[in-house]
Amino acid sequence: WNVGDDGFDTDQSWSGTLDNFVIINPAGHIFELDGPEGTYANGHTIKNGDVYVGIGQDLINVDANSIVDLMDIYFTDITGLNQINRVTAVGVTFNNIVLNVDSVSAYVNGTVPSGITAGQTPKANTSPLSWTWAKIAGLF
């Protein structure tokens, strides 16, 4: 919450899994998912999350060589300035990415992949996050 930079930033072939999360009002990109550097090329998975965009910039920012599976992520509080910057990166998959907008075409740079749709169904299980200050402050 209010990280002042990217909501979640991966670099240098991070190979983990981010599962069940909430990102609130980052100042930079929501997801800054850089590709591998050098010869080590591993991918990662990001799944089951809710994103409250607010002043965030790109919803999802990937490089041409990023390797990431994105699944079951809900974006809300989107403005006309937000977009998914690249949907043609070979190593990036989109599965059940839901934008709380009327039509996703204005928020995707290029042809909208089948895994990105408009809707209003959150994806994160927020009950394990009830202890956080963001939850106590009523931000989700």
PLM feature spans:
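Extracellular beta-rich repeat passengers
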Residues: 1-140
